[in-house]
Amino acid sequence: MSKLITTEPLKSMAEVISNYVIQRESFSARNILNKNSLVKKEIRYDLEVPTSADSIWSVYSCPDIPRLLRDVLLPGVFQKLDVIEGNGGVGTVLDIVFPPGAVPRSYKEKFVNINHEKRLKEVIMIEGGYLDMGCTFYMDRIHIFEKTPNSCVIESSIIYEVKEEYAGKMAKLITTEPLESMAEVISGYVLKKRLQVFGFEIKPKLRFNLLLCLIICLVIAGGMFVAGVPL
């Protein structure tokens, strides 16, 4: 029996287990290496606007903003900007195509966060675009900060992760320029709407003079009324 009973089965089991552990450790090491080979970047553009935070946020958070950008604020910029899923709220997916020569030419993006309390909107790229050029993650973040009751700051950020070997190339391609354009046209749109009286645009420099004239007219009219002078 001593010749029949050996430790070979236990040796085989030990070898199988040790090989399994080694493979798991090797797999974990590769995962750590892959994670370490990703570069995370964040770039930002701030624009101060002389109007309330709520008025600016009302445009950024508007469910109709895809149509507004395509047809009103940035006409001619997009070859296509279609809502293919959702109604303008969280979960909405846009299919965006730019004219030939643009980089990137096309991509799909998704609204993943619209926080009215914080005035925060986050949109991630889910297909095409920079994801086909070395990025593993790309997000636009818009945060509207109130500065005073009549002024605010539009904080436009881009957060992305890219494979280390593509980091230099993508740093040259990814800029805040698209978000800058959006912030400028939206703020201009809000200011123009706010400064209209009876359909006529009132330039910012004339606001104080207009208000002063209105006050003087009211004072004169009030004085004439008190004095019994017919108006």
Curated annotation (Swiss-Prot):
Binding of dopamine, residues: Y107, K108, E109
Protein induction: Up-regulated by elicitor treatment.
InterPro entries, alphabetized: Bet_v_I/MLP, Plant_def-hormone_signal, START-like_dom_sf
Top EC category: hydrolase
Disulphide-bonded residues: none
UniProt keyword annotation of Protein biosynthesis present: no
Entry membrane topology: Single-pass membrane protein
Temperature dependence: Optimum temperature is 50 degrees Celsius.
Additional remarks: The 40 amino acid N-terminal extension should included a signal peptide targeting the mature protein to the endoplasmic reticulum.
Designated name of the protein: S-norcoclaurine synthase 2
Species name: Papaver somniferum (Opium poppy)
Native organism taxonomy: Eukaryota, Viridiplantae, Streptophyta, Embryophyta, Tracheophyta
